[in-house]
């Protein structure tokens, strides 16, 4: 008697099943070796999700077309066989990837945590413990100046690395990280060097001496408000969170320079709702997810709603600014000049939107962090405050207590103090990624192959004995009097260096110098009783830029 189909124990004949499984695994291996090993695949991650869903349906259709007796359209046997084949395909793909990254990868000789060789998510997982600049510093203390921190990522702490990766003659380019906001573009996110240089020329028109004097008029309005608020709180001589007030000041200022309208945070003494949305939306940058995963998350409304709310607010505000004429030029005026009064195209709107976001985020966070770090060092080094006041005393301030910036820019100790603070507390302390050229680069006798991601964290670089003598000692005089204490000046790059350096550096330094000079001459600064500020500095977080959320100090009016 012949067995019935219901007596058949296998979902498909065993020989056929083994052949199908072997083919599926081989296809997975070939997919990795012939496709995913080459090029970039981060811009449209959902395409790969859709492709594999279609592949699954295609496999199901092929099996169903064979019509083994037990298959029906909704058969669990069909579902199990398709699932097994797809799982085998994925096992082949990831097994090939795993073997390649651990045994055959061009970076296999570079030291680092074993798990970092396998996946970029290793670093993202470690960042739950703290910001990247501290985690990377720990890794360098354990593994040395050159550390593999991901499958294709290398962190290097050496002055030569700063020159080779970021310097004016560097052949490194920007990596996939800068596509996270695509299709919204900004000067910061252009990866193509020619396109970047063309856009930078447009920006440069807004950072000449004449333009900076115009911005100073705008900033002075908000600086006056800031000091009025600080003076009112100094009367009580109780602790205030100076970091919060610098954030209010910075966002109000940069909102005005970007959109010709303030966020009015100094007036309200609280964050604007859109700034809260921005801060929440930037949290994803803290974990340095692979670009494809970041872009996957960014399309999920439940995970990126705050970010998209801010973009909506900024888009509406930017479009209003496009149609306005302003009496005192702002940065955006130079960015609008190429339009010659016409409406922007969709690509130009994305570009203007990206640039507006860049002005706000880069200008606000970095300035507020730098000012907070300077106050921290002022409160820790009262002897340095005396030197700064001795330098400022001969200079005449106006009736509002403001100093001419041209004069401040020439003061050696003031600028040495600012530099020393930025050395130890750089506003961008961790990862500024670059992609090595096809021919690779040599750094500190180590060859980094082409198309790898490299970076040199400024927080660790500022503490490197290869760059500075006694790097842990705060000594402003190393920048003008004892310059032998700086072994290699190229290691100091708080605004980065080279073709992709911060174009807003002159504006930031003007803002910092004028604010710090007035603060020093207006107030005595100290920590509250029993505090030294260290725990608040140690609690600093990072979402590309450093964020110091708390820095309580007591201000006492001097006059």
Curated annotation (Swiss-Prot):
Membrane-protein topology: Multi-pass membrane protein
Binding site for heme: 502
Pathway membership, UniProt: Mycotoxin biosynthesis
GO cellular component terms given for this protein: membrane
Entry annotated with the keyword Transmembrane helix: yes
Keywords recorded for this protein, A-Z: Heme, Iron, Membrane, Metal-binding, Monooxygenase, Oxidoreductase, Transmembrane, Transmembrane helix, Virulence
Enzyme Commission designation: 1.14.14.118
GO biological process: verruculogen biosynthetic process
Listed Pfam families: p450 (PF00067)
CDD domains tied to this protein: CYP67-like (cd11061)
Name of the top EC class for this enzyme: oxidoreductase
Family of this protein: Belongs to the cytochrome P450 family.
Function according to Swiss-Prot or TrEMBL: Cytochrome P450 monooxygenase; part of the gene cluster that mediates the biosynthesis of fumitremorgins, indole alkaloids that carry not only intriguing chemical structures, but also interesting biological and pharmacological activities. The biosynthesis of fumitremorgin-type alkaloids begins by condensation of the two amino acids L-tryptophan and L-proline to brevianamide F, catalyzed by the non-ribosomal peptide synthetase ftmA. Brevianamide F is then prenylated by the prenyltransferase ftmPT1/ftmB in the presence of dimethylallyl diphosphate, resulting in the formation of tryprostatin B.
Name of the protein in question: Tryprostatin B 6-hydroxylase
Primary gene name: ftmP450-1
